UniProtKB/Swiss-Prot annotation:
UniProt enzyme class: lyase
Gene behind this protein: pyrF
Reaction(s) catalysed (UniProt annotation): orotidine 5'-phosphate + H(+) = UMP + CO2
EC number: 4.1.1.23
Complexes and interactors: Homodimer.
Protein's UniProt name: Orotidine 5'-phosphate decarboxylase
PROSITE patterns assigned: OMPDECASE (PS00156)
Annotated metabolic or biological route of this protein: Pyrimidine metabolism; UMP biosynthesis via de novo pathway; UMP from orotate: step 2/2
Chain sites annotated for binding substrate: 11, 34, 61-70, 117, 179, 188, 208-209
Gene Ontology terms for molecular function: orotidine-5'-phosphate decarboxylase activity
Length: 233
């Protein structure tokens, strides 16, 4: 099922900055928030407990990639934090992804990163030594993710349709790199607007700087949310 709330990427360096940012929103508004490496390493597990205590949903974006037993043990800890979604690198392999699923359990969604949206095809071929097209690599990883029993993948919006065709229509496609028209793309190589992401079939979208660095973050969030959901029945 699609998530009507854009996921806000809390790419902040400290707990205090997060508190200041969230204070801009009405206390009763339930948000979907992404905690990435920078914030998690700065604030620790307490940041997840804090956000959950405020009634928000949390996507813990740590992209685990290690031997299966280590990932399984780490996922057991993350399940105790009450995260709503977390992820691994599909490149870790099917056995690692199966171990992650076992460790996390079924209470939270588990997705895999195929290729980072900052990766171009030329970079993939040169540095990863993968001599296929970028799309072929993404589809391969998506199929392996489905085989491992995960809920979906992180992918660019341009790849959503082929991934769902290669797996199944209910396979989650979470799309970062979402930018409203006219906003700078930053370090993302493959970007799309919220409306385009909806039309192409994305289930979740992640938006960072267009909200967090906006002059009015609350207004920016609601404008993006409105664009994302404008054609929903």
């Amino acid at each position: 099922m699609r998530e009507h709330r854009p996921i806000i990427a809390l790419d902040f360096p400290s707990f205090e900055v997060v508190k200041e940012f969230l204070a801009l929103f009405p206390a009763e508004e339930s948000l979907y928030l992404k905690v990435g490496m920078e914030l998690y390493y700065a604030a620790g597990p307490e940041i997840v407990s804090y956000l959950k205590g405020l009634g928000h949903s949390v996507f813990l974006d740590l992209k685990l990639h290690d031997i299966p037993n280590t990932v399984k043990s780490a996922m057991k800890i993350l399940s105790q934090l009450g995260v709503d979604m977390t992820n691994v690198h599909a490149a870790g392999g099917v056995e690692m992804m199966k171990a992650a699923r076992e460790g996390l359990g079924s209470q939270a969604k588990l997705i895999a990163v195929t290729q980072l949206t900052s990766t171009s095809e030329a970079q993939m071929q040169e540095f990863q030594n993968i001599q296929t097209s970028l799309q072929e690599s993404v589809i391969h990883y998506a199929k392996k993710t489905a085989e491992a029993g995960l809920d979906g993948v992180v992918c660019s919006a341009q790849e959503v349709q082929v991934i769902k065709q290669a797996t199944n229509p209910d396979f989650i496609c979470l799309t970062p790199g979402i930018r409203p028209a006219g906003v700078a793309v930053g370090d993302q190589k493959r970007v799309m607007t919220p409306a385009d992401a909806y039309q192409i079939g994305s289930d979740y979208i992640v938006v960072g700087r267009p909200i967090t660095q906006a002059e009015d973050p609350v207004a920016a969030y609601h404008a993006i949310k409105d664009e994302w959901t404008q054609d929903w029945n």
